[in-house]
Amino acid sequence: LLFLMGASTGAAYAVANPGVTGVKITQQNGACTGVVVDATGETVIGASVIVKGTTNGTITGLDGDFSLSNVKKGDIIQISFVGYQTVEIPWNGQPMNVTLQDDTQTLGEVVVTALGIKREKKALGYAMQEVKGDALLEARETNLANALTGKVSGVQIIRSSNGPGGSSKIQLRGANSVTGLNQPLIVVDGVPMDNFTGASNNDIDNPTLDMGNGLSDINAEDIESMSVLKGASAAALYGSRAGNGVILITTKKGTKREGLGITISGSVSAETTFMLPKRQKTFGQGENGVFDSTNGYSWGPEVTGQSYTKWDGTTANMQIFDNVKNFFDTGVNLSESISFQQQYDKTSIYTSLNRMDDSSMIPGANLSRTNLTLRASSTFGKDDRWSIDAKVQYINTLAENRPISGARGNNAFYTIFNMPTTIDIRDFSSPVKDEYGEMIWWSKGGINPYWSKDYNPNKDSRNRFLMNGSLKYKFTDWLDAEIKAGSDMYFTEGEEKLYAGSPTNNKNSRYSTSEKKFFENNFSFLISGHKDELFGKFGGNFSFGGNLMERKSTGLDNAMGKLTAPDLFSLANGDKKDL
């Protein structure tokens, strides 16, 4: 049971109406001069003064003064400074006295902070940045984590190369632990979410399949905003597991406008290889300048188009092939969404359905995801002091032929990068097996990546439920209390097959299954207050709350290393069990 309590104070600001003061009438010849002050009359040092549409500019000095030469009458003078409204004034030849007003939109910007509390950004005592939902839709990323790339300072996104839906790693302000566990806590609508959904061991030598992380389950269309909390304050609010920071996700609610609103959207995107590894294109297969059709190196004779005998005994003219480029396809991502928003008096309802299909650049690798969301919120009671909010979200993810990680022969990337450059990978695309049912490949080691697609396939499915509900009561305009409950649960099933004829299992086949069950329940209460001008111009806020978390995870892996009847994939068909 974790109890949290905190308080902070700060100045309450009174902001005058925006405007610009007048201009002294004293003729100057081609030099625009003046003074810049704020609403209190204090000089503004370092304000930018520029002729709009040009590079002719300067900054104000210690007394807020400036002098700008080569200015024509009628030119627009633009004055700006952080935290103030930008001013544009046409110059009529006289010195300028300019008053900058506070940018009330920036100072009064309300953001969603820890535990779902809304605060003015200026009053926060810790670093945080917010990204609006529209900005996350610009690139239409399969994994939501990738959409943060370049949008938040100090956030490093390490993208996965493991096909569609692969995990992406997030680090806030560098590495905080030598163990490598540096990822922030993910919180959706005030409820923590598990960002690790598991990996699976493949059949041959147990390399790993990346089955994606929690953020890859979230539909970007449902997001209102994402906030990034950095520093120790995140740990103070969410406990030790938030020591690496927190990413807060706020999802959409129904509109407050009367009537029914329908939004339909769709997108199509394509992906292809951008940067390919560079390999030497002078020498062919072999070593020490000598050709050898069984050698895996590319330091044989110089390639001049000479005739040679290939791995299959046929004769051809030697040439260099770009196997990396020739292996990958053009990936296509399709996404369709529809959402309904309905307002009934004081109750709003939001429903959305999204379908995403991703055909990877990797031949045979595919991912599909379906998101269904239902959310309702309402206010009731005297003066609408009571408010209730509830949401249920279901996500189904299906994947086929996720690429295998590790420096293993059944890793397509590893195989292609280590092939001799005078062997064409496309020669093995069809057929992939001979008349004896064995795999066609140029050497006795490694696996034909086209064979893996059909005869060493893997697939997995994940069903996830995200649920939360809250009840809030507002005692006064500055004091309220809230209780909240949330649950994150998912069920993952995986299957891997190895057909007879593979070089590591020529006579028999292999079959394995895996399953994982996970749930986390959170129950919390929070009493919070915020009041401006509590002591003169000073205001303050406080919060007191607690959280009870219940978490459980179970898993089961089964493997049949030698099937009695080849290619009959059943756990009952085998005489050897690898558990």
Label each PLM-derived region with a short phrase.
Residues 66, 170, 247, 338, ...:
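Membrane-embedded beta-strands of outer-membrane beta-barrel proteins
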Residues 14-52, 76-85, 92-137, 145, ...:
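Short, acidic, small-residue-rich periplasmic hinge/interaction motif at the N-terminus
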Residues 130, 151, 163-168, 178-184, ...:
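Residues embedded in well-ordered regular secondary structure
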Residues 94-99, 109, 144-146, 170-173, ...:
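N-terminal periplasmic accessory domains that precede
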Residues 55-65:
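Short, acidic Ser/Thr/Gly-rich low-complexity loop/linker segments typical of extracellular
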Residues 273, 314-354, 358-365, 371-445, ...:
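Flexible loop and strand-edge segments within Gram-negative outer membrane beta-barrel domains
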Residues 76, 156, 224, 259-263, ...:
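Membrane-spanning beta-strand positions in outer-membrane beta-barrel proteins
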Residues 35-39, 127-150, 158-162, 170-177, ...:
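Short, polar/charged loop or turn motifs at beta-strand boundaries
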